[in-house]
């Protein structure tokens, strides 16, 4: 991706590979912070892909398995364990197989904008926005948050009410992000920036796939939640 701060967006450059080599041993030298942020980006791929407007049965299978693998493996990958690296290599790959067919949502739209305007690492921005966007989207996701909570290892989801399992899924994402050391606020964001940020995110290519249509004013309110 190439960032352009003037328009507040990150533009994707695509060069389709003939073959991709996914080798966890090649990831063993990644710093902890990079492992954490890219892992949360992969989780955002999986959760947004699972809940996007275009989601369907086949991609749901990919995304739920990716959520399960990433949730089980990211802490270990950050600690550089062999099992953690292997699980993340497979989880991020499966998430890519899913979302590349159905697109993403406004967590990515907003993360693209934060990256372009403030040079925020993409995975960090995704991790900040994901639980906020999940809370915003929850009324338009049916029972999918129950399956997200289950895939993330939450116990007793079958006995939970809709309100309870939706909160459990969001809380599980927050805990994983905190456990791998990602902050929940971005001090660079100022009130006077919100209009530009929201306009840019609203125009992002990922925004139309969000399960709940977000207005510019909605996006301003969501950006406000990561302000210090």
Segments predicted by a language model, with ranges:
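Single conserved hydrophobic/aromatic residue that forms the stacking wall/gate
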Residues: 1-8, 12-13
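Core active-site phosphate/anionic-ligand binding loop and the adjoining beta-turn-alpha structural block
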Residues: 10, 16-78
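Glycine-rich phosphate/pyrophosphate-binding beta-alpha loops
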Residues: 93-126, 204-209
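Gly/Pro-rich interdomain helix-loop hinge
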Residues: 117-196
